[in-house]
């Protein structure tokens, strides 16, 4: 019996080290499903929704650094992959999506479930190609895999179900050679120019992102040599924050006042491996130097006075011998003092209260009780705020989220991918009640896959971050209310340990119990509804917006909201 196209794909993926494929099966994927069953070396991870499959594959790729795979059946099946694939692509992780298609003879006829996948996936992939004949598959699959790995993003192979069942070309090899990522270092002449510029610069600040992964030692040495405070972006937190005497916190909408003021007061700002997008948080008068492995990132969000293309570790390693050590610490010491004040202010907000459970306190205790090498995932919205401000990184912990794409409902799906990839490590999903309930169907996948993830729901019965933005704009928070749900009872009904927490005095015991259980657990914590995530700088328009919101709330007979807002944030 001749090898089918589907079998060729399965064996090629096996040779590339792929261990699992995430997806929802369907008739257009029958060829692939059958080949995987016969082969027995790649596990099919059956989710309830394809979006979850894409998020899970993205988390796997982010943790392993290797190619991860997801699949969707024709039409609606692979359409459901798109949001998760956008997140993978914008996170720069290598993911291959197999998008099954309708019978090849029916393409263009308006057939049942027909879509145009090549157009639909174009914006969330480096490569998207239709396999219309078996002869194409060796080249198309190899190119797709190579582009996903080397370009760090998504590739999509569109495969009609009938083509998958046809014989593969004779003599097609399934050998996969893993090409290593190139190490890019700027020319020495460019490095000397940068060293000279830094020599005559004062009040230097560093802004660091996820491109600093693996460069912690070089980064700290560089900052120490030029006496520069280090500000980090959210995606840089896990790589930069720990064991760092020069760290002064984050900047941005959910950052620290110390990080914000350090950047704004800098005369020279060095951007290292970051695509920080918020123009309002860049200084207007400073010289800006940018170093990034991706030339397309240069000058994308701010003006740039000097730019070098290179990976951060090798570039700093080559730059360090050329840089003259500075003696003046005034700017650095002021930034560190501001950071200590900002950190104390944030820690003061994370104290237990008899009136309500503050989410800051919950996040702080999660960090305290979690394993030293825990993997955290956090939903977009207020859980990301609390994770950014209160989780302590140590070089072993990881933090995953939808930090570039900003999609709701990412935390639980990413936790599935993380736990499957790292079965011996503790995985903690910090979910909002809005995000968790959006893709709650895959809570059943936790049971089915027997994945011991720990899910903590920040249950405030509101789309918290959206409501806060509406208040800042002066709007009433219509449409943000969520039904008060007991998620612990839902967990128990699904066969998972559920723990309900309604008092701050119960938090520690609940977390300790959850983290000690050898299996999945959901901790449903009722947190303060009107908690504000104060940005590092309050603009006049925001202050006016809050005043207008409070006036409108009182006029509309919703004065109780204003009272609760005051009690939660100012009358503790």
From Swiss-Prot:
Entry keywords, A to Z: Cell inner membrane, Cell membrane, FAD, Flavoprotein, Lipid-binding, Magnesium, Membrane, Metal-binding, Nucleotide-binding, Oxidoreductase, Pyruvate, Thiamine pyrophosphate, Ubiquinone
Gene3D superfamilies: 3.40.50.970, TPP-binding domain
Any single GO CC term annotated in Swiss-Prot or TrEMBL for this entry: protein-containing complex
Annotated positions for site Moves into active site upon enzyme activation, plays a role in electron transfer: 465
Disruption phenotype: Not essential it can be deleted.
Keyword Membrane assigned: yes
Reactions the enzyme catalyzes: a ubiquinone + pyruvate + H2O = a ubiquinol + acetate + CO2
Outcome of substituting residue 533 to T: In poxB11; poor activity in vivo, no longer activated by lipids
The enzyme's E.C. designation: 1.2.5.1
Chain residue ranges for the region called Pyr domain: 1-182
Location of region: FAD-binding domain: 183-334
Entry remark concerning the domains of this protein: Has 4 domains; the Pyr domain which binds the pyrimidine moiety of the thiamine pyrophosphate cofactor, the FAD-binding domain, the PP-binding domain which binds the pyrophosphate portion of thiamine pyrophosphate and the C-terminal membrane binding region, which includes the in vitro-derived alpha-peptide (residues 550-572). The C-terminus is held closely against the rest of the protein and covers the active site; during activation it detaches from the rest of the protein and folds into an amphipathic helix upon membrane binding.
UniProt name for this protein: Pyruvate dehydrogenase [ubiquinone]
Originating species: Escherichia coli (strain K12)
């Amino acid at each position: 019996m001749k090898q089918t196209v589907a079998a060729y794909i399965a064996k090629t993926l096996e040779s590339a080290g792929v261990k699992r494929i995430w997806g929802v099966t369907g008739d257009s994927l029958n060829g692939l499903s059958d080949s995987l069953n016969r082969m027995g070396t790649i596990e099919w991870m059956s989710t309830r929704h394809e979006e979850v499959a894409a998020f899970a594959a993205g988390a796997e790729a982010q943790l392993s650094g290797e190619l991860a795979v997801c699949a969707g059946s024709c039409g609606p099946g692979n359409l459901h992959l798109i949001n998760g694939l956008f997140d993978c692509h914008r996170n720069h992780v290598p993911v291959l999506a197999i998008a099954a298609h309708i019978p090849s003879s029916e393409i263009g006829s308006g057939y049942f479930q027909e879509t145009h996948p090549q157009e639909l996936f174009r914006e969330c992939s480096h490569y998207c190609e239709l396999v219309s004949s078996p002869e194409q598959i060796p080249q198309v699959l190899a190119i797709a895999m190579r582009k996903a790995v080397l370009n760090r993003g998504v590739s999509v192979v569109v495969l009609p179900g009938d083509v998958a069942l046809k014989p593969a070309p004779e003599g097609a090899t399934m050998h996969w050679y893993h090409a290593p990522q190139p190490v890019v270092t700027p020319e020495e002449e460019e490095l000397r120019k940068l060293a000279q510029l830094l020599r005559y610069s004062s009040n230097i600040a560093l802004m660091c992102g996820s491109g600093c992964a693996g460069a912690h030692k070089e980064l700290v040495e560089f900052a120490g040599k030029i006496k520069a405070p280090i500000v980090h972006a959210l995606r840089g937190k896990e790589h930069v924050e720990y064991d760092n005497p020069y760290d002064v916190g984050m900047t941005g909408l959910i950052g620290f006042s110390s990080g914000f003021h350090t950047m704004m007061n800098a005369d020279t700002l060095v951007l290292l491996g970051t695509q920080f997008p918020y123009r309002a948080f860049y200084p207007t008068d400073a010289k800006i130097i940018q170093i990034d492995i991706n030339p397309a990132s240069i000058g994308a969000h701010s003006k740039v006075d000097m730019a070098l293309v290179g990976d951060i570790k090798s570039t700093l390693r080559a730059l360090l011998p050329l840089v003259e050590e500075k003696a003046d610490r005034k700017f650095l010491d002021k930034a560190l003092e501001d950071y200590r004040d900002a950190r104390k202010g944030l820690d003061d907000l994370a104290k237990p209260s008899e009136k309500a459970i503050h989410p800051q306190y919950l996040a702080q205790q999660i960090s305290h009780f979690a394993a030293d090498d825990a993997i955290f995932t956090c939903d977009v919205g207020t859980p990301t705020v609390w994770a950014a401000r209160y989780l302590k990184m140590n070089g072993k912990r990881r933090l995953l989220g939808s930090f570039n794409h900003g999609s709701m409902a990412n935390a639980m799906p990413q936790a599935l991918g993380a736990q499957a990839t790292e079965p011996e490590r503790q995985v903690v999903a910090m979910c909002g009640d809005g995000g968790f309930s959006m893709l709650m169907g895959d809570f059943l996948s936790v049971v089915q896959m027997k994945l011991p993830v720990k899910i903590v729901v920040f249950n405030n019965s509101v789309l918290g971050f959206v409501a806060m933005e509406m208040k800042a704009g002066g709007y009433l928070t219509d449409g943000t209310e969520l039904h008060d749900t007991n998620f612990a009872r839902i967990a128990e009904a699904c066969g998972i340990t559920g723990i309900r927490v309604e008092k701050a005095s119960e938090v520690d015991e609940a977390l300790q119990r959850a983290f000690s259980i050898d299996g999945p657990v959901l901790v449903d914590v009722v947190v303060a509804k009107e908690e504000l995530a104060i940005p590092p700088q309050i603009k006049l328009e925001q202050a006016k917006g809050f005043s207008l919101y409070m006036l409108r709330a009182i006029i509309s007979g919703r004065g109780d909201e204003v009272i609760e807002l005051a009690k939660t944030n100012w009358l503790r």
